[in-house]
């Protein structure tokens, strides 16, 4: 053994003795090569994310205009984690959580941990304590813009507080990122949109809370309403586009189109029908949709209703879509029950 190798081995032993086993290792020795994920609750979004869902132990930012469906997208992720036996938490800084709507989306509100903090510092400290416990699988912070620093709350209305929120977020993310990775918690930060003043060229839109969240996020999703969905004269929902604007675990810039129905959330039938039609799993002839020469219905809404009533057929079609894109179902379910991840 060369002197260099002996010196390296000695240094590695010293590091492990000082900081614990696993504090340094060769990249190939890592037990987990493949990114462990949890489904987003939307098949179209799972495909757009490229790895079959949200990566565990990472920070996700979901941003977009008001009433575009940001909270709906995050509540579907909570419902999916709970369905797989995981623990979820919701930091409601906006004080606008609707338990009735959450329940309709499949969230078990009896098991969901909810905090409505008074200040930004309090909200982020609660989030840190939950992450460090190692017992929470997903935590949603709604929203970054509502995480108001204590100094701003205690000050007067006209006081200037330049950069306070950005500093708060920067400090919090420095502390949180390592703990999130170790505990395999998915941390979803919901954010709003602001306009930069005096921008002549380029996009004037920006997100509040400084640049730290943009850097620390593994995935950034932009949620925007595309068009209204009508049934007769009634508006029953919105067609929504979710664009993956940043992705460190798969190619970015993919777009998922979903129907967000009022009082129901993301329409599983709608996304399955659209994706199956694109892949020719479901055939579309004129206004008729058919599968294996069996007619599903005339028109998109009738076909969606047919799939809603025939869940076995719907899940069979979903299985073929997942198979085509190489996505396995419940990829993160076994991780939630693996206590070794919490060591």
Swiss-Prot record:
Asked whether the UniProt record includes Metal-binding among its keywords, one would answer no
Q: Which GO terms describe its molecular function?
A: ATP binding; ATP hydrolysis activity; ATP-dependent DNA damage sensor activity; damaged DNA binding; single-stranded DNA binding
Q: GO cellular component terms?
A: cytosol
The UniProt annotation places ATP binding at: 64-71
> Which superkingdom is the protein from?
Bacteria
Give the GO terms filed under biological process for this record: DNA recombination; DNA repair; SOS response
Gene3D superfamilies tied to this protein: P-loop containing nucleotide triphosphate hydrolases (3.40.50.300)
**Sorted alphabetically, which keywords does the UniProt record give?**
ATP-binding, Cytoplasm, DNA damage, DNA recombination, DNA repair, DNA-binding, Nucleotide-binding, SOS response
**Transferase as a keyword?**
no
Q: Which InterPro entries match?
A: AAA+_ATPase, DNA_recomb/repair_RecA, DNA_recomb/repair_RecA_CS, P-loop_NTPase, RecA-like_C, RecA-like_N, RecA_ATP-bd, RecA_C_sf
Cellular location of this protein? Cytoplasm
What family does the database annotate?
Belongs to the RecA family.
What does this gene product do? Answer: Can catalyze the hydrolysis of ATP in the presence of single-stranded DNA, the ATP-dependent uptake of single-stranded DNA by duplex DNA, and the ATP-dependent hybridization of homologous single-stranded DNAs. It interacts with LexA causing its activation and leading to its autocatalytic cleavage.
Q: What is this protein called?
A: Protein RecA
Can you name the source organism? Bacillus cereus (strain ATCC 10987 / NRS 248)
Tell me the name of the encoding gene: recA
């Amino acid at each position: 053994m060369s002197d260099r190798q002996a010196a390296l081995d000695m240094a590695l032993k010293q590091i492990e003795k000082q900081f614990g086993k696993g504090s340094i290792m060769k990249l190939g020795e890592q037990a987990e090569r493949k990114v462990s994920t949890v489904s987003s609750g939307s098949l179209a979004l799972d495909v757009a994310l490229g790895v079959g869902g949200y990566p565990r132990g990472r920070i996700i930012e979901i941003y977009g205009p008001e009433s575009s469906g940001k909270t709906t997208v995050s509540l579907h992720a909570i419902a999916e984690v709970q369905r797989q036996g995981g623990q979820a938490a919701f930091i409601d800084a906006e004080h606008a959580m609707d338990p009735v709507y959450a329940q309709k989306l499949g969230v078990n509100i009896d098991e969901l941990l909810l905090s409505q903090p008074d200040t930004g510092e309090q909200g982020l400290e609660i989030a840190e304590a939950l992450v460090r416990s190692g017992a929470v699988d997903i935590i949603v912070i709604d929203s970054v813009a509502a995480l108001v620093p204590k100094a701003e709350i205690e000050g007067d209305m006209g006081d200037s507080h330049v950069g306070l929120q950005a500093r708060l977020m920067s400090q919090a993310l420095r502390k949180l990122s390592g703990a999130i990775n170790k505990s395999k918690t998915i941390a979803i930060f919901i954010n709003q949109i602001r306009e930069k003043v005096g921008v002549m060229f380029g996009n004037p839109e920006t997100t509040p809370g400084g640049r730290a969240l943009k850097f620390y996020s593994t995935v950034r999703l932009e949620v925007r309403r595309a068009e209204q969905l009508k049934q007769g004269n009634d508006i029953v929902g919105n067609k929504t586009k979710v664009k993956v604007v940043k992705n460190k675990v798969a190619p970015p810039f993919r777009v998922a189109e979903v129907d967000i129905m009022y009082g129901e959330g993301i329409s599983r039938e709608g996304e399955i029908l659209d994706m199956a039609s694109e892949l020719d799993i479901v055939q579309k002839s004129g206004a008729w949709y058919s599968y294996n020469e069996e007619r599903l219905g005339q028109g998109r809404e009738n076909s969606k209703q047919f799939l809603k009533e025939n869940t076995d057929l719907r899940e069979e079609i979903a299985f073929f879509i997942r198979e085509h894109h190489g996505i396995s179902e419940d990829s993160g379910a076994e991780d939630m029950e693996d206590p070794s991840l919490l060591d």
